[in-house]
Curated annotation (Swiss-Prot):
Entry binding sites for Mg(2+): D47, D115
Family affiliation: Belongs to the endonuclease V family.
Plastid among keywords: no
Keywords noted in UniProt: Cytoplasm, DNA damage, DNA repair, Endonuclease, Hydrolase, Magnesium, Metal-binding, Nuclease
Name used for this protein in its record: Endonuclease V
Native source organism of the sequence: Xanthomonas campestris pv. campestris (strain ATCC 33913 / DSM 3586 / NCPPB 528 / LMG 568 / P 25)
Pfam families assigned: Endonuclease_5
Site (Interaction with target DNA): Y85
GO molecular function: deoxyribonuclease V activity; magnesium ion binding; RNA endonuclease activity, producing 5'-phosphomonoesters; single-stranded RNA binding
Cofactor(s) recorded in Swiss-Prot or TrEMBL: Mg(2+)
Cellular localisation: Cytoplasm
């Protein structure tokens, strides 16, 4: 497998085996406790798409007012795609672009939502956990599909949820965010508790399946239209 090693992965030899080993090591740094302000001012959503037949990784960042959930900033970062998709190693493919997008924000978010897994991952170190450990920012993973673990299908109403278990331990939540839609896979990434990940995701839901931070980032990453910014943010 041909890879271009980003400085954020210093010490990685580019192999799948060592990438998995690094995940297991870095997973020990994940903090599953709530370290988010009770009244955060800024949230951010991140998602990734691809251009040029997959040769370019396109990372979208959207900064939102935490009270109104209206967007304040949007940015897109583009970097050459460094490696092919390997299940469970998404961060080694997408994290360099996400960090570039984060650097474009004029203000630092208090809490970050990533389109992808937090600790709901075979080695409990998905892209939201990796992002959080590298940046130090509280993070939550919100994925559209399950990667690891099992769960009982939650009820059909908005807000219904059930725990996702792996080897007898909870790694996330299956959350029915919208009736007649498949559940989201929600899990803490870093500096957020299991319950906190669920609560914050519920707080940021509106009329759509995805919470506003990742919904807007998904829209920007997939080039489905411009996002109108809130020009006068609410002061908390």
């Amino acid at each position: 497998m041909q890879t271009s090693i980003d400085p954020v992965f210093a010490g990685w030899d580019g192999s799948v085996a060592q990438a998995r080993q690094l995940q297991q090591q870095l997973a020990q740094r994940v903090a599953l406790r709530d370290e988010v302000s009770a009244a955060p001012a800024l949230l951010a959503g991140f998602d990734v798409g691809f251009e040029d037949d997959g040769q370019t990784t396109r990372a979208a960042a959207v900064l939102l007012d935490a009270q109104t959930l209206l967007p304040l900033e949007t940015h897109v970062a583009r970097v050459p795609t460094s490696m092919p998709y390997v299940p469970g190693l998404l961060s080694f493919r997408e994290l360099p672009a996400l960090l570039r997008a984060l650097a474009l924000l004029a203000r630092t978010p208090d809490l970050v939502f990533i389109d992808g897994q937090g600790i709901a991952h075979p080695r409990r170190f998905g892209i939201a956990a990796h992002f959080g450990v590298v940046t130090g920012l509280p993070s939550i993973g919100v994925a559209k599909q399950r990667l690891a673990g099992t769960f009982i299908e939650p009820g059909g109403e908005r807000g219904d949820h059930s725990p996702i278990l792996l080897a007898g331990a909870q790694i996330g939540w299956a959350l029915r965010s919208k009736p007649r839609c498949n559940p989201l896979i929600v899990s803490p990434g870093h500096r957020v508790s299991m319950q906190g990940a669920l609560d914050w995701t519920l707080r940021t839901l509106r009329a759509y399946r995805l919470p506003e931070p990742t919904r807007l980032a998904d829209r920007l990453a997939s080039r489905r239209g411009e996002i109108e910014l809130q020009t006068q943010p609410t002061l908390l």
